[in-house]
Amino acid sequence: MIEFHNVHKTYRVAGKEIPALHPTSLRVDSGQVFGIIGHSGAGKSTLLRLINRLETPSGGQIVVDGEDVTALDANGLRRFRQQVGMIFQHFNLLASRTVADNVAMPLTLAGDMPRKQIDQRVAELLERVGLSDHAKKYPAQLSGGQKQRVGIARALATKPKILLCDEATSALDPQTTASVLQLLAEINRELKLTIVLITHEMDVIRRVCDQVAVMDAGVIVEHGKVADVFLHPQHATTRRFVQEDEQIDENEQRDDFAHVQGRIVRLTFQGEATYAPLLGTVARETGVDYSILAGRIDRIKDTPYGQLTLAVTGGDMDAAFARFTAADVHMEVLR
């Protein structure tokens, strides 16, 4: 478990104090995939690097599995960092070393494992990330996705309890991003590894995360289960992320709906309700008519969800709306 207690970070620039992270309290449960999303300058990289003390907090307490890592001396910090792996946006591989040597680097530097055991561990890791045939290649001979897989294997070398991912997919194309995220999900599931990742992409959060924190200007403005946060956003920053992801322009949408008659509502379905024939049932029971103005079906990790924007006319609208609510469908009246 990772706990932040009133942690903050301030940089001193040209004699002025610049806050990068305002006082923050946060908990990441063991075995979770926890996502932190925010635009550039939101403070997410600072927060991530505080976990393994690549950044030193200006105040507050960071506790990992009951240990106060803010109080560790140099030896204690070195020991602690062996329990935390990290992968980076631009891979950070040594160009002059082979794939196998890059993966072996943390074990070689630790200096407490015989070479034969290092070679065995490297072979296991390359098999896990699907690169057994690339052990003797150099980074320049690999694709972006393969380089990131090497980075993941290297991060797992010391058998860490925590894996930190710093914009790990932002330099990859969509197809490669999907395969890397699938690999991270498998690692989380099979190794029971706690993963904390930062990103500016909603799709990354939606695919792999259990919980999410939304950051803006050094503050966590909203956090919780991914479905709760993104299907029912409360803060303006979260709503902007949702609108960007769905490519919604509220002004354009308002103009498009101006000529539409009736009440306009947005329905959000989760789980089994996503595929239930609810609209037809409600229309028959209450006599309302509806037109579908917009809609989508997608998944948040393993959970399907759907959203429909409807124009509702005629019949008993109050009864129809009550029926939606009774069926655990979230309804928002837009007009």
From Swiss-Prot:
Annotated ATP binding sites? G38, H39, S40, G41, A42, G43, K44, S45
- Pfam families, sorted: ABC_tran, NIL
| Membrane topology term | Peripheral membrane protein
What cellular component terms from Gene Ontology apply here? plasma membrane
- Class of enzymatic activity (EC top level): translocase
Task: Show the GO MF annotations.
Answer: ABC-type D-methionine transporter activity; ATP binding; ATP hydrolysis activity
Alphabetical keyword list:
Amino-acid transport, ATP-binding, Cell inner membrane, Cell membrane, Membrane, Nucleotide-binding, Translocase, Transport
Give the residues annotated as coiled coil: none
Q: What is its main location?
A: membrane
Which CDD domains is this protein grouped with? Answer: ABC_MetN_methionine_transporter
Reaction(s) catalysed by this chain, per the record, are: L-methionine(out) + ATP + H2O = L-methionine(in) + ADP + phosphate + H(+); D-methionine(out) + ATP + H2O = D-methionine(in) + ADP + phosphate + H(+)
Q: InterPro entries attached here?
A: AAA+_ATPase, ABC_transporter-like_ATP-bd, ABC_transporter-like_CS, ACT-like_dom_sf, MetN_ABC, MetN_ABC_transporter-like, NIL_domain, P-loop_NTPase
* ABC transporter domain location: 2-242
State which Enzyme Commission number(s) the record gives.
7.4.2.11
Where found in the cell? Cell inner membrane
Protein family (similarity comment) = Belongs to the ABC transporter superfamily. Methionine importer (TC 3.A.1.24) family.
Give the protein's biological function.
Answer: Part of the ABC transporter complex MetNIQ involved in methionine import. Responsible for energy coupling to the transport system.
Matches recorded under PANTHER family = AMINO ACID IMPORT ATP-BINDING PROTEIN (PTHR43166), METHIONINE IMPORT ATP-BINDING PROTEIN METN (PTHR43166:SF30)
Assembly with partners or alone = The complex is composed of two ATP-binding proteins (MetN), two transmembrane proteins (MetI) and a solute-binding protein (MetQ).
How is this protein named in the record? Methionine import ATP-binding protein MetN 1
